[in-house]
């Protein structure tokens, strides 16, 4: 593909890309399933190096690669634990770089994906590192909005929950900064407010935002509500987690009382108790659509990066 900005490129942060790059990805995602029959990744191998537990992201990448005719090498579970205890990460990445045509890495340490990209010659895709970045999640989240509304621009967004430790929420907010939202409400307890660098990205690009604590105060304005769980595994003090757990709960009664009928609720999953099951069969629910579209977006991304 002429003018493909993804070909052979590392995917470390959503902010490494432009709005135009993402719009190209969206167009490719719209048609990628019709191309899958030609097996564009036939003969290609993707290493999935998951040093942190994952179900959805790993299966989504694995499905995406296999639908395109490629194959995967998986490091997870006991293999990842033994590597974490002994072998140097650089040695592991060097080994995978010799076996595979691309590497997807997920790691609990911030900066691990960038480090892997510096070591490897093949493209490295960040499947989530620490609390910092989860670019492919942001890509599929933005694509979901695009699919539902036909645009990412001009909408009012609410991002709810753990905005301090949650990498999916941070990446989504950073992704929104590449577009032109009407307004972004950042809804969280004071202890879990968005980090300064995330706010600075919004400010730098002139995206209007407001930090609030009560969902009910802004729910009626929202076109999209992006809900995240409290990140138990990233909050250092268990007592702090217990005090914050259950800070927000989105129920069908709440939505029917305050929200627009056209509101769509997104969630990167897994959820704990922040969205009641009553929402699942309502007109507001879009998180299962979001999960389904994730495979399509990752198919488009892997095809663009590995084949062009």
From Swiss-Prot:
GO term, biological process aspect, one: amino acid metabolic process
Binding sites annotated in the UniProt record for L-aspartate: 85, 167, 229
Catalytic activity: carbamoyl phosphate + L-aspartate = N-carbamoyl-L-aspartate + phosphate + H(+)
Keyword terms of this UniProt record: Pyrimidine biosynthesis, Transferase
Gene Ontology MF terms: amino acid binding; aspartate carbamoyltransferase activity
Pathway of action: Pyrimidine metabolism; UMP biosynthesis via de novo pathway; (S)-dihydroorotate from bicarbonate: step 2/3
EC number(s) from the headed UniProt entry: 2.1.3.2
InterPro entries associated with the record: Asp/Orn_carbamoyltranf_P-bd (IPR006132), Asp/Orn_carbamoylTrfase (IPR006130), Asp/Orn_carbamoylTrfase_sf (IPR036901), Asp_carbamoyltransf (IPR002082), Asp_carbamoyltransf_Asp/Orn-bd (IPR006131)
Residues annotated to bind carbamoyl phosphate: 56-57, 106, 134, 137, 269-270
One protein family per Pfam: OTCace_N
Subunit structure: Heterooligomer of catalytic and regulatory chains.
NCBIfam families cross-referenced by the UniProt entry: asp_carb_tr, PRK00856.1
Role: Catalyzes the condensation of carbamoyl phosphate and aspartate to form carbamoyl aspartate and inorganic phosphate, the committed step in the de novo pyrimidine nucleotide biosynthesis pathway.
Record family assignment: Belongs to the aspartate/ornithine carbamoyltransferase superfamily. ATCase family.
Name the record gives this protein: Aspartate carbamoyltransferase catalytic subunit
Originating organism: Aeropyrum pernix (strain ATCC 700893 / DSM 11879 / JCM 9820 / NBRC 100138 / K1)
Gene: pyrB
